[in-house]
């Protein structure tokens, strides 16, 4: 019986016709399979993990080999076809719109440029020799950009306003001598000053200066803030920090505040992001309205840093900054946080209505909680100063530290209205002369010097110096302490030094301390000076101003602070030698830092319009110019 095709016992095997179709597929199978499996060392997973460095090296070798071959194969370029570099301001400016400084260049047939001593976001600062007055000066050259010019015009207006109310230069504000336009750059001529307070700290290897020198610095800074708070001025500095406080002389404790590039007047606030982070006040961090009290907060931070050698609040960002403040001072008042637009950036509201610190990824692992890092421990009130380094030293008793701690805490009040005012600070017990201090410094009427040996006998230091006369940047400047100015001194020994170390206002203990009035308009019931005539030196019983014997500076970096003459004798802060310095053959021949009298800016020569820009009459610049910046 015939079996139908496909139904036999071997029906699962292909028939003759199907076999011929399958055979080609079987023959192609070996071609599709690799002859050998890939080496494990060349697997992508290994190349991107264990052998990642080798992979990168191989990529670099291949890349640069191809680049070299392309360079060899490319035809030589004709120099005439090269793209010409863009020329700015007829070749006088660089790509950043800064003036290209050339040593030896003479401006207005008067200023001979010596060297560049500083650079910042505003522009540059150069040291120059004024042939008309035979003095060294510092010239701040503003960038050739409209926004920077507008902001510099505001700074210029404030500086001229302060100079009008401080004709004797005794309120520790940098003196603007004159201004002019040169090749489309606004140039501000300042007195040439010495090192800043950060350089002074650096010279102590960040161990801090004595409490006595801290007191002298605090007294001058409070006087300067009192001057700025007069109703005729009402100026907020907005960037008070050690880098913006300069010594007049490297051997004296006289200081001056510089860099009013971020400053404003009450009621005319321009920016919200102001102050360097370490010295930024809580109201600025929280986004609430601010007034002159923000400078008092910065001053409190500065005083602690000057004595301990380290910033009190050294936050890495704004959140960390607030955390460090809370760590010392506790949670801010609920009434303040309720009105703060940025309160929830740092804090969380509790169900009961209070506030607690916001737990974020930015919170430090070593954070100890609100109020756990006490200021008493930071200052070493009961342990002989910071790290016990001042134990047994005269003027560093627990009573001295308690007065210092109380003053700082009053400066660091959260509420701006409760923060101590400059006048109240000058009346604080920290500046009063006690019986123990009189014993340490000798009789009040004694003329015998109790100061250390002349500074010329101290060993020289290899620390690099840093000088500033007016520069700096806005509150958004870097907190990495860029050293903007550098210079050296030359000179010789000078006359002996008279030390009147403990001169300070004598205020009866019963007189109460008045808090800061707060707000944009001075409060009538608070002890705000009615005019400049009520400031120190014009009738009010406030700290006398420093007067200094002429003494040329040291050829080295800042002296050890303990060898500085910290005397403050009645009279204006004088940074000049006893006699006018003769004109050197070249500005580099002498780096003696002096003070000269002011004057009106000279008009540019009319026969040189190509070289000089038009004279700019910037007196009385309206505040509206700030809008474009």
Swiss-Prot record:
Q: Where along the chain is the active site annotated?
A: 239
Q: Which reaction does it catalyse?
A: L-seryl-[protein] + ATP = O-phospho-L-seryl-[protein] + ADP + H(+); L-threonyl-[protein] + ATP = O-phospho-L-threonyl-[protein] + ADP + H(+); L-tyrosyl-[protein] + ATP = O-phospho-L-tyrosyl-[protein] + ADP + H(+)
Top enzyme class:
transferase
What does the entry state regarding organ or tissue expression? Highest expression in skeletal muscle, testis, heart and brain with little expression in colon or lung. Expressed in a variety of tumor cell lines.
Region feature (Interaction with RANBP9): 480-520
* Ligand binding (ATP): 117-125, 140, 190-193
> Which EC number applies?
2.7.12.1
Q: How does it assemble?
A: Dimer. Interacts with DCOHM, MAP2K3/MKK3, RANBP9 and TCF1/HNF1A. Part of a complex consisting of RANBP9, RAN, DYRK1B and COPS5. Interacts with DCAF7. Interacts with RNF169.
Q: Which GO terms describe its cellular component?
A: chromosome; nucleolus; nucleoplasm; nucleus
Q: Where is the Protein kinase domain?
A: 111-431
In terms of CDD domains, this protein maps to: PKc_DYRK1 (cd14226)
Q: What is this protein called?
A: Dual specificity tyrosine-phosphorylation-regulated kinase 1B
- Gene3D superfamilies, per this entry? Phosphorylase Kinase, domain 1 (3.30.200.20), Transferase(Phosphotransferase) domain 1 (1.10.510.10)
Please indicate the residue ranges that the annotation assigns to the motif Bipartite nuclear localization signal: 69-86
Q: How, per the record, is this protein's activity regulated?
A: Inhibited by RANBP9.
Q: Which PANTHER family match?
A: DUAL SPECIFICITY PROTEIN KINASE, DUAL SPECIFICITY TYROSINE-PHOSPHORYLATION-REGULATED KINASE 1B
Q: Residues bearing Phosphotyrosine?
A: 63, 92, 111, 129, 171, 271, 273, 401
Compositional bias segments (type: Low complexity): 438-478, 586-600
Residues with the modification Phosphoserine, per the entry, are 262, 624
Impact noted for substituting residue 275 to R: In a metastatic melanoma sample; somatic mutation
Quote the annotated effect of residue 90 to P. Answer: In AOMS3; expression of glucose-6-phosphatase is significantly higher than wild-type
Q: Where in the cell is it found?
A: Nucleus; Nucleus, Nucleolus; Chromosome
Changing residue 140 to R has the effect of: Abolishes kinase activity
């Amino acid at each position: 019986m015939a079996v139908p095709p496909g139904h036999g016992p071997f029906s699962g095997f292909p028939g003759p016709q199907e076999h011929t179709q399958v055979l080609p597929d079987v023959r192609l199978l070996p071609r599709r399979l690799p002859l050998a499996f890939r080496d494990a060392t060349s697997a992508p997973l290994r190349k991107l993990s264990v052998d990642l460095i080798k992979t990168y090296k191989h990529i670099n070798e291949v890349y640069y080999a191809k680049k070299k071959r392309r360079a060899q194969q490319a035809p030589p370029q004709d120099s005439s076809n090269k793209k010409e570099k863009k020329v700015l301001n007829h070749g006088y400016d660089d790509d950043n719109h800064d003036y290209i400084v050339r040593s030896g260049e003479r401006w207005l047939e008067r200023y001979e440029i010596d060297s560049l001593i500083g650079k910042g976001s505003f522009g540059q600062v150069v040291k120059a020799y004024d042939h008309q007055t035979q003095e060294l000066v510092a010239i701040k050259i503003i960038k050739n950009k409209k926004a920077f010019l507008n902001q510099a015009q505001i700074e210029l207006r404030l500086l001229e306003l302060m100079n009008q109310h401080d004709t004797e230069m005794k309120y520790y504000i940098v003196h603007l001598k004159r201004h002019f336009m040169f090749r489309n750059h606004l140039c501000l001529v300042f007195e040439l000053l010495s090192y800043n307070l950060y350089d002074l700290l650096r010279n102590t290897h960040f161990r801090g200066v004595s409490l006595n020198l801290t007191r002298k610095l605090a007294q001058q800074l409070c006087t300067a803030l009192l001057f700025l708070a007069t109703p005729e001025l009402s100026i907020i500095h907005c960037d008070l920090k050690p880098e913006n406080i300069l010594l007049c002389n490297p051997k004296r404790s006289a200081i001056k505040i510089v860099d009013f590039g971020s400053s404003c007047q009450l009621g005319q606030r321009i920016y919200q992001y102001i102050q360097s982070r370490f010295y930024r006040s809580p109201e600025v961090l929280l986004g609430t309205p601010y007034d002159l009290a923000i400078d008092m907060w910065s001053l409190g931070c500065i005083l602690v840093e000057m004595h301990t050698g380290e910033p009190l609040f050294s936050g890495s960002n704004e959140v960390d900054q607030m955390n460090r403040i809370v760590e010392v001072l506790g949670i801010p008042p609920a009434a303040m946080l309720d009105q703060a637009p940025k309160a929830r950036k740092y804090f969380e509201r509790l169900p009961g209505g209070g506030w607690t610190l916001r737990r974020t990824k930015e919170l430090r692992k070593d954070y100890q909680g609100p109020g756990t890092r006490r200021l008493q421990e930071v200052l070493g009130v009961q342990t002989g100063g910071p790290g016990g380094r001042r134990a047994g030293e005269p003027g560093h008793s627990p009573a001295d530290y308690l007065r210092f701690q109380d003053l700082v805490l009053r400066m660091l009040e959260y509420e701006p209205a409760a923060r101590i005012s400059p006048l109240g600070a000058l009346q604080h017990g920290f500046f009063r002369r006690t019986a123990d201090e009189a014993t340490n410094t000798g009789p009040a009427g004694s003329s015998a010097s109790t100061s250390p040996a002349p500074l010329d006998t101290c060993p020289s230091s290899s620390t690099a110096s840093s000088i500033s006369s007016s520069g700096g940047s806005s509150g958004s400047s870097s907190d990495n302490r860029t050293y903007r100015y550098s210079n050296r001194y030359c000179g010789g020994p000078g006359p002996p030094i008279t030390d009147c170390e403990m001169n300070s206002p004598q205020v009866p203990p019963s007189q109460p301390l008045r808090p800061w009035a707060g707000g944009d308009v001075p409060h009538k019931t608070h002890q705000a000076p009615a005019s400049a005539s009520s400031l120190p030196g014009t009738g009010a019983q406030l700290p006398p101003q420093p007067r200094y014997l002429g003494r040329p500076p040291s050829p080295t970096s800042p002296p050890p602070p303990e060898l500085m003459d910290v005397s403050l004798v009645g009279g204006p802060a004088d940074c000049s030698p006893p006699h006018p310095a003769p004109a050197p053959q070249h500005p580099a021949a002498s780096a003696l830092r002096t003070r000269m009298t002011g004057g009106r800016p000279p008009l540019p020569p009319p026969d040189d319009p190509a070289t000089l820009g038009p004279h700019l009459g910037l007196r009385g610049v309206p505040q509206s110019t700030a809008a474009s910046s």
